[in-house]
């Protein structure tokens, strides 16, 4: 895979291809084959030697799908993702995360117990403790609950209390001050009655 970088240079990443993929020499579907080989690989490809470190916190981490995507994106641009924190209230999903990203501090807890301050307020003792355990954060990723924001089968959930969990992402960004923040959600989140996007 070749990725064009902002400075005009290129970063290359490689995946060992299966015999089946090697037989198909067409360009059609090449990206899908590349991604499929990556997802099916028994061992993850290595990062380039001397790759710069990108420290990542994943809130509402689940089993780590967003972290996996960011891991591959970092590898594609010759960087090395270092997961420093994964938080999710689902212990089973977090166990899967832990098996895929062994170095991360994984905390099976509702995020509001760890990031408990209001936006704009001083850092709380709980938040200070969490930050001291993880150090610097370069990228914050997360997918707060989207059921209350979805237009599918949604008649009463626009006022669901879980919709406010979106603000925990903003609060963590405020206190950890990452360089980049990626929040995944449904597009209808913009219509939330609590104006969580604003």
Please describe what each predicted stretch is.
Residues 1-8:
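N-terminal accessory interaction module
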Residues 8, 13-198:
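Conserved active-site and SAM-binding loop architecture
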